[in-house]
């Protein structure tokens, strides 16, 4: 009789430990091992001089090329065994340029090496490269401006300006016209441009990142871009 009771206690203990591991394991992984997700991209917090921070002056006319410090990435909300987190990937292999004339960005085209975008988890990166974005067949993402960006309300101070951009975005081999808000500012001899865009996966024929029984994600993610442009 005692042996039977001991066996039951042992079984209950095993089940309890398993349940704690099932619930507590993801919590420990997300909050202590993986750590908090990276903050959203933002314009650099640097000291600016009001004498050279106003776009639209003659010194800004011409072609501006993507330089070091430019970043592109994604943010996707995940639920891992009931624990909420945000998957974040970042990359810096960006090329392209923008043409500024007066207070107008008259042309712009940018290209991103999609395979260079990485998170802090190797398994997530493998899913991103193969199952989700298929970087072998679709190695690049591109954006081409189709309407000039008018900066007529540009303030002559160090504060960022706001504008709206429209162009053709190609992701996963699918091209759609998109319109999004952006912020831009002149910092010394450079121009920084910040923007983001909500991407609905099905709209771009992108496989939903969810994995049955393991992780559930939203049906959309945020595309983040921070461009650091230098005068050509």
Regions found by a protein language model. Name each.
Residues 2-232:
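Low-complexity, acidic/polar, glycine-enriched regions of mature
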